[in-house]
Regions:
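Gram-negative (and chloroplast) outer-membrane scaffold detector with strong preference
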Residues: 46-139, 166
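Short glycine/proline- and aromatic-enriched beta-strand/turn motifs that initiate or cap beta-hairpins
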Residues: 20-65, 165-171
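Internal, hydrophobic beta-strand segments that form the core of beta-sheet-rich folds
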Residues: 141-143
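Noncatalytic linker/hinge segments flanking ATPase motor cores
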Residues: 37, 67-75, 145-153
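Outer-membrane beta-barrel "beta-signal"
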Residues: 88, 154-171
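Short glycine/serine/threonine-biased micro-segments
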Residues: 28-30, 107, 124, 161
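Cleavable N-terminal export/targeting peptides
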Residues: 1-24, 168-171
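Solvent-exposed loop/turn segments connecting transmembrane beta-strands
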Residues: 29-42, 80-84, 111-121, 148-157
Length: 171
């Protein structure tokens, strides 16, 4: 009886966890540093389809800091009031690398938003590597390149973002 009960528990546990990564939804929080003095933050909702391919709908904010003219350091005015952008967009993320407890996606998307003066359109290309943690949480590292149109001050933004994906309520 004890063997049958242990076998039944093992089968139920394995079958329940076998579909843990399929068709799941996650809330994503990421923050990173981009080339030429920029801090980037993204909040997103991600829907994962078959084979770790995913759709992401995101809100992105970026702050570009500069050294203060009066003190020569980075102060609150030179950080927060220098140059800011925000955007809302979508990205498709096909899976290109799969392994045990990790997978990698290309990230291809676009966005629309604004800086402090005018409209900005963005084209986003990058690579995201995901590491599965416990209870459906995921740690990700993202290398990104953003092309902002028609802005000449901040045309290309390249950098690295690190964040977490938190699972939503299961269906």
């Amino acid at each position: 009886m004890k063997k049958i009960l242990l076998t039944l528990i093992a089968v139920i546990t394995m079958s329940a966890s076998a579909f843990a990564q399929a068709n799941s939804d996650r809330i994503t929080f990421g923050m990173g540093v981009l080339y030429e003095n920029s801090l980037d933050a993204t909040i997103a909702w991600e829907h994962e389809t078959k084979y770790h391919n995913a759709w992401e709908f995101f809100v992105n904010g970026n702050v570009k800091w500069d050294e203060c003219q009066s003190c020569g350091h980075i102060c609150p005015d030179s950080f927060w009031k220098n140059y800011r952008t925000w955007g809302v967009g979508a990205a498709y993320k096909p899976c290109v690398v799969r392994g045990r407890n990790h997978y990698g996606n290309l990230r291809i998307g676009d966005s629309a938003g604004s800086n402090t003066d005018k409209f900005l359109g963005g084209i986003h290309v990058g690579y995201e590597h995901n590491f599965a943690l416990r209870k459906g949480w995921v740690l990700f590292v993202q290398a990104k390149c953003d092309l902002l149109i028609p802005d000449r001050e901040d045309l290309f933004r390249e950098g690295i973002t690190v964040g977490f994906k938190i699972p939503t309520i299961k269906k």
